[in-house]
Amino acid sequence: MRQVAIYGKGGIGKSTTTQNLTSGLAELGKKIMVVGCDPKADSTRLLLGGLAQKTVLDTLREEGEDVDLDTIMKTGFGNIKCVESGGPEPGVGCAGRGIITSINMLEQLGAYEDELDYVFYDVLGDVVCGGFAMPIREGKAKEIYIVASGEMMAMYAANNISKGISKFANTGGVRLGGIICNSRKVKNEKELLEAFAKELGTQLIYFVPRSHEVQKAEINKQTVIQFNPKDEQADEYRALAKAIDGNDMYVVPKPMAQDKLEAILMEYGLLE
C-alpha cells in the first residue's frame, strides 16, 4: 500500500487534482482511500457527487467515541473510499490535531486493513505546522507530491513545504515524489517549474493544462473522468495517474534560499 500526501498552497487546486488523479487510478483498477485533511471538508466532494460528508470530528463530537467505520467512510466514484477529517469549531482548537485524531480513529476502526493500493491525504495549504505535517511527521505518508503553478506564491509555498519534508525525511522516511503543475497559464510556466523542480532535486512529474472542462465537471459535482470521459482533460488526468503509478524517483528535497528562488523567477520572466 502506497501512502501519498498531496500538499500545496491554499487555492492551488489540490483537492481537484487529487480527486481527478484518484479517478484515473481507479480506472486502472486500483483500490484507493482518500482522506481529506482540510477543515473545509471538500476533499471528496466530486467523488461523492457533491455529498456533504459527515466529518470524523463532527461525528466524534455528536456520537462520542463509539463510532462505526460506515459512519465516517463513504464509497464514491470508482469504489474510492472517502473520509473527511474535518476541523475544530472556528476559533477553538487546532485543525492539525483533528488530522491526528482522524487518522488514529481510522487505524483503530481497521480502515487500512482493506486491501488498498493507495491512501491519499489531501492536506491543507501552505503551513507545514505540527498538525498539518502529521501525515509526514508520523511516517504515515511515505511519498509526497506538491501541487504548484508558475505563480510566485505557489512556488514560495512549495519551497516551504520542501523544508518541512527535508526536516522529517530522516525520522519519518518520507520522500518527495515530484511537483505536479496545475497550470495557471503563466508565461514560460512549464520551463519555470522544470527549473524549480531541478533546483529542489526533484522532477516535474506532470503538467496539467488549464481547462474549462474542470470547472464544468465541478459544477456538476463530478471529476472530469466521470463527467466527460472522452474529453482531452480526462486523458490528462489519466496520464497524471499513470505517471504517479509508475514513479520511481523519490528524493529528500533541497529547499532553496529566497534569493535563489527569485533568481529562477527572474530568469523565466516572472519578476520583470
Curated annotation (Swiss-Prot):
Instruction: Provide the alphabetized UniProt keywords.
Output: 4Fe-4S, ADP-ribosylation, ATP-binding, Iron, Iron-sulfur, Metal-binding, Nitrogen fixation, Nucleotide-binding, Oxidoreductase
**Reactions catalysed:** N2 + 8 reduced [2Fe-2S]-[ferredoxin] + 16 ATP + 16 H2O = H2 + 8 oxidized [2Fe-2S]-[ferredoxin] + 2 NH4(+) + 16 ADP + 16 phosphate + 6 H(+)
List modified residues, type ADP-ribosylarginine: 97
Q: Does the keyword NAD apply?
A: no
**Disulphide bridges, residue numbers:** none
Residues engaged in binding ATP: 8-15
Q: Which residues bind [4Fe-4S] cluster?
A: 94, 129
Give the cofactor note text. Binds 1 [4Fe-4S] cluster per dimer.
Spell out the molecular function terms from Gene Ontology: 4 iron, 4 sulfur cluster binding; ATP binding; metal ion binding; nitrogenase activity
Q: Which cofactor does it need?
A: [4Fe-4S] cluster
Q: What is its EC number?
A: 1.18.6.1
What's its top-level EC category?
A: oxidoreductase
Protein task: The key enzymatic reactions in nitrogen fixation are catalyzed by the nitrogenase complex, which has 2 components: the iron protein and the molybdenum-iron protein.
Q: Which family does it belong to?
A: Belongs to the NifH/BchL/ChlL family.
NCBIfam families the UniProt entry points to: nifH
Oligomeric state and interaction partners are given as: Homodimer.
Give the protein name, as stated in the record. Answer: Nitrogenase iron protein
